[in-house]
From Swiss-Prot:
Reactions accelerated catalytically: S-sulfanyl-L-cysteinyl-[protein] + uridine(34) in tRNA + AH2 + ATP = 2-thiouridine(34) in tRNA + L-cysteinyl-[protein] + A + AMP + diphosphate + H(+)
Residue positions of the active site: C99, C196
Organism: Gluconacetobacter diazotrophicus (strain ATCC 49037 / DSM 5601 / CCUG 37298 / CIP 103539 / LMG 7603 / PAl5)
UniProt GO molecular function: ATP binding; tRNA binding; tRNA-uridine 2-sulfurtransferase activity
GO cellular component assignments: cytoplasm
This protein's name: tRNA-specific 2-thiouridylase MnmA
The UniProt record lists the keyword Transferase: yes
Record function comment: Catalyzes the 2-thiolation of uridine at the wobble position (U34) of tRNA, leading to the formation of s(2)U34.
């Protein structure tokens, strides 16, 4: 089988390529260039200049062709600009979902088809299982590296074409050991950290550089609109956060947290967790990996990347879905809400922003 491997230059995708070559497949490697080469050597980024070099070294070692795809403009428009716009709208976005669904699983997958590939493989930690109604997306064996939450927007058609060979690996140590057995130069290469386009972990700095109107101090207010403090920029906050509140962090003997953000007025609304948590969510941009349910769907939902899934009832609506959690939580607008049945991903969408009392100036 002719298979394209999306090679990031890291150990995971390199092992995928090596394993497929060893299995006798006709393998083609491809790496996305997401940044200008003069800016792409920053530590902790993926798809940067050093990573392209590492991917090419691995491809040479394996004796496979390797292509570098210039995706800088597309990445900036569909991922970075969208990320900044979401923050400007008071949301906490998940740019990795946009990157996977757009640049990788639409653009790169299309190139794979153009090159005559019958499948595209990646180093993601998820499992693709053939079910009675086609390919299913599942959590990996190594749940500590589970990336299924970030891949919920993968369509059923894309899933038929994709392969995830690392989904059954027990842990990262086993992947590195396999890389050493194949003699790959990246066997000990560190994992990429944080968002690839945020070199120092400061989301606020990136957003404020792209949207200067977002910079500047503002008010911290309670649910009634009363000013209880000041902050150094709304881009530094997300719903559910309790850090950076200063003297407003404790009120009336209760620990406070962010319950709403209004970028237009630069107001951060705070309140105690008790009384601020919600059970009802509204989702937009739904992607279903099953036939959409006609009635109530009982399932587990995960509302943050590193939170445990929780029981809920989901209902399809004309413009997305509604979710009723069994127990109240603090969902952040713009984050993904992914639906699970055990290990299987059923679909998901993005949490809509709610109007908050106290936000208006």
């Amino acid at each position: 089988m002719r298979i394209m491997v999306a090679m990031s230059g890291g150990v995971d995708s390199s092992v995928v390529a090596a394993r497929l070559v060893a299995e006798g497949h006709e393998v083609v490697g491809a790496t996305l260039q997401l940044y200008d080469s003069r800016e792409s050597a920053r530590k902790g980024a993926c798809c940067a200049g050093r990573d392209i070099h590492d991917a090419r070294r691995v491809a040479d070692r394996l004796g496979i062709p390797h292509y570098v795809i210039d995706a800088e403009t597309r990445f900036r428009q569909s991922v970075i600009e969208t990320f900044a716009d979401a923050y400007a709208g008071g949301e906490t976005p998940v740019p990795c979902v946009a990157c996977n669904q757009g640049v990788k699983f639409t653009d790169l997958l299309g190139i794979a088809r153009d090159l005559g590939a019958e499948a595209m493989a990646t180093g993601h930690y998820v499992r693709r299982i053939e079910g009675p109604d086609g390919a299913e997306l599942h959590r990996p064996v190594d749940e500590g590296r589970d990336q299924s939450w970030f891949l919920f927007a993968t369509t059923r058609q894309q899933l038929e074409f994709l392969r995830f060979p690392l989904g059954d690996m027990p842990d990262k140590a086993a992947v590195r050991a396999e890389a050493e057995r194949f003699g790959l130069s990246v066997a000990a290469k560190p994992d990429s950290q944080d968002l690839c386009f945020v070199p120092d972990g400061s989301y606020a700095r990136v957003v404020e550089a792209l949207r200067p109107e977002m910079a500047g101090e503002g008010e911290i207010v309670d649910g009634s609109g009363r000013v209880v403090g000041r902050h150094d920029g709304v881009t530094r906050f997300t719903v559910g956060q309790s850090r950076r509140l200063g003297d407003a962090a404790m009120r009336d003997g209760a620990r406070q947290m962010v319950v709403g953000i209004d970028p237009a007025s630069r107001r951060v609304v705070i309140g105690p967790r008790t009384g601020s948590a919600v059970r009802d969510l509204s989702l937009r941009d739904m992607n279903w990996l099953i036939d959409p349910p006609e009635g109530d769907l009982r399932c587990l939902v995960q509302i943050r990347a590193r939170e445990a899934a929780r029981p809920a009832t989901v209902r399809r609506t004309a413009d997305g879905a509604s979710v009723t959690l069994d127990e109240a939580a603090m969902p952040a607008p713009g984050q993904a809400c992914v639906l699970y049945d055990g290990s299987r991903v059923l679909g998901g969408g993005f949490i809509r922003r709610r109007e908050m009392a106290g936000a208006a100036a």
